[in-house]
Amino acid sequence: MAKVIKFPIQTPEKFGFKPVRRRKTTSDKKPGQLNLFTGGKLVKLNQLSSFEEALLMDEQGDAKAKGLYQKAIQEGDAIADAYCNLGIIESEAKNFGKAIDCFTLSLKEEPRHFESHYNLANLYAEIGNFPLAKVHYETSIEIEPEFPNSHFNLGLTLAMNKEIENAILSLMNYRKRATAEEKCHADELISTLTRTITT
């Protein structure tokens, strides 16, 4: 008679949110149109924009960052980035509805905003909405295919959604992009998932 041995299942940690750490450049240029005034440049001396100030406060853990991100949005300063980072603040405060609203407003402003798709996927996975998490992880991979955490988290989400074969494939994609130390963790997960298929 065969004996079934249960292996202890370790819940792998998901990677956290990915805040926007720099101001993205926006181009007002029209395709095929030459700029006649390339030499002129407005230089602000020792003055940060509202978004840059919010980012600085946020990195220091200052609660004023939330208000400064809102100010940046009102001023039209890095709107998608500000909404994204505001979504992280709301998510960390467990205001999931507000966080989802912030991330989707960021995507309304910039539909291919990588960090918003990735963070929205993390949030959906955290609250247990795996089908929506899957969609946003897949979108973040389409936008930035070399970001390893998207592949790892997609693998975890697929495993939670009982899509084991696809989870293994996603973890193998993560493994290709991971450091040597991170590969060991991925190998353990792949091995565990493979055993669930073969038994």
Name the predicted role of every residue range.
Residues 47, 80-81, 114-115, 148-149, ...:
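Helix-start (N-cap) detector for alpha-helical repeat units in TPR-like alpha-solenoids
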